[in-house]
């Protein structure tokens, strides 16, 4: 075969979409679709029709450009097996590695606290509204739930990993089915309450502030950054030796693009379906009650009384159960990340980074007590979940997902070719706006 024929054959092979690419599209999509999605309709719908339309326009650019920027940073590592920690160590030295370890821990730990509050509130709402049982002490409920989860995590972690993996796509399927099932209950309230004369761009309830606060929830909900490093390593091992790094970067971008489209379609359809069923006032009430949208929907159908259909009854109980399973799935996944981050900090400072010297069984137990204890305190205090996401969860995610890659583009020679791209300014602005949520929450 001539060299020309080899090139043509190689190009044909390059353009082929592989099964592994499809698996990663679904893997990235599945990582993002979790309990965080259950709060997005509340934040998006609380301002009415116009803000959620703006969020619809921003959804894909936020999901795609931010994750592509992080993937490019991961791709800049010298070896195809370098993960994000290795890559940051190469570019910024040991101090940079320590900073990333801190950011990684503090990006995930607040999310665990959020899910601790959420699962407590969801269980209490199910207990009182669906089971119609008398109120129980919040501290006891939170402690009991956390002890049960700690038991399963400590004694059956491997089994739980498998179970949670199997639950990802059934949860997504349920989310789509609920979105479709709500169609018969769509009302025109969102349109009848829409008044152009009462709209304002500025002010605490203006469109710009609502969209700004919504961006933080979007960064939180449309987030598959925890798996991007593993994804890039996998694609580099699969493609880079045969086709080069530039092609691998293009393939990663295409996979991220398709995952982002899938994610935006599912989440935004779910958000619009909830908004057409409820009203902005309902969304405000859901925020005040500090419960996810599925729990509020369950309570909404419960309030229909004896006149409700069997269909509505199924939705009522199904929504609550799906919410509990989704939150437990997200809690478990973020617990493992928090445990890894806390162990990493203890090993880095207590054992000078020598993992072989650390008694891992004892360390896991100490970390579990610290993590579960702090989660119980936060769950008992019951801070507003959307405010907690805006003040802690989303800003730290934005620092890792948006600002770190943009800083690397400015400073690292291997990423200099991406300087001056319009998408860089967009990603930087999204990161800064998300972090500025902290200032708004303190005002």
UniProtKB/Swiss-Prot annotation:
Organism domain of life: Bacteria
Keyword Nucleotide-binding belongs to the record: no
Catalytic reaction equation(s): L-threonine(in) + H(+)(in) = L-threonine(out) + H(+)(out); L-serine(in) + H(+)(in) = L-serine(out) + H(+)(out)
Membrane topology (UniProt): Multi-pass membrane protein
Cellular component, GO, one term: plasma membrane
UniProt main location, coarse: membrane
GO MF, one annotated term: symporter activity
Disulphides: none
Membrane-spanning parts: 24-44, 45-65, 95-115, 140-160, 163-183, 207-227, 259-279, 319-339, 363-383, 385-405, 423-443
Subcellular location: Cell inner membrane
Alphabetized UniProt keyword annotations: Amino-acid transport, Cell inner membrane, Cell membrane, Membrane, Symport, Transmembrane, Transmembrane helix, Transport
Function, as annotated: Involved in the import of threonine and serine into the cell, with the concomitant import of a proton (symport system).
HAMAP family cross-referenced by the UniProt entry: Thr_Ser_transp_TdcC
Family per record: Belongs to the amino acid/polyamine transporter 2 family. SdaC/TdcC subfamily.
Database matches in NCBIfam families: PRK13629.1
Protein's recorded name: Threonine/serine transporter TdcC
């Amino acid at each position: 075969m001539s060299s020309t024929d080899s090139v043509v054959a190689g190009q044909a092979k390059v353009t082929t979409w592989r099964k592994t690419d499809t698996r990663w599209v679904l893997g990235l999509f599945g990582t993002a679709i979790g309990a965080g999605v259950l709060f997005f309709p509340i934040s998006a719908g609380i301002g009415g029709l116009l803000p959620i339309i703006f969020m619809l326009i921003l959804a894909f650019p936020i999901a795609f450009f931010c994750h592509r920027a992080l993937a490019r940073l991961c791709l800049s590592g010298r070896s195809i097996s370098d993960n994000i920690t290795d890559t940051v160590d190469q570019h910024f030295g040991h101090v940079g590695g320590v900073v990333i370890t801190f950011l990684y821990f503090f990006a995930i730990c607040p999310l665990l606290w959020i899910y601790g509050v959420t699962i407590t509130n969801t269980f209490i709402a199910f207990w009182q509204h669906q089971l119609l049982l008398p109120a129980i002490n919040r501290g006891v409920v939170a402690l009991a739930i956390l002890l049960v989860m700690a038991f399963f995590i400590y004694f059956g972690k491997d089994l739980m990993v498998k179970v949670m993996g199997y639950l990802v796509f059934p949860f997504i399927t349920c989310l789509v089915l609920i979105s479709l099932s709500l169609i018969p209950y769509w009302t025109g309230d969102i349109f009848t309450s829409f008044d152009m004369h009462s709209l304002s761009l500025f002010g605490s309830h203006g469109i710009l502030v609502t969209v700004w606060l919504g961006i933080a929830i979007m960064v939180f909900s449309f987030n598959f950054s925890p798996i991007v490093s593993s994804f890039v390593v996998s694609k580099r091992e699969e493609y880079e030796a045969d086709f080069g790094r530039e092609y691998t970067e293009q393939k990663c971008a295409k996979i991220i693009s398709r995952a982002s489209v899938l994610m935006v379609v599912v989440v935004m359809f779910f958000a619009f379906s909830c908004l057409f069923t409820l009203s902005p006032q309902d969304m405000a009430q859901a925020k005040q009650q500090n419960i996810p949208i599925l729990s509020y929907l369950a309570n909404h159908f419960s309030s229909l009384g004896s006149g409700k259909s069997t269909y509505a009854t199924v939705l009522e109980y199904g929504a609550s159960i799906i919410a509990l399973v989704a939150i437990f799935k997200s809690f478990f996944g973020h617990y493992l990340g928090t445990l890894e981050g806390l162990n990493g900090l203890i090993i880095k400072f207590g054992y000078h980074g020598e993992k072989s010297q650390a008694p891992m069984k004892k360390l896991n137990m100490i970390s579990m007590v610290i993590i579960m204890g702090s989660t119980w305190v936060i769950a008992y205090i019951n801070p507003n979940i959307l405010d907690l996401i805006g003040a802690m969860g989303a800003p730290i995610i934005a620092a890792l997902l948006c600002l770190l890659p943009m800083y690397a583009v400015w400073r690292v020679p291997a990423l200099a070719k991406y300087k001056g791209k319009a998408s860089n300014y967009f990603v930087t602005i999204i990161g800064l706006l998300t972090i500025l949520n902290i200032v708004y929450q303190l005002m």
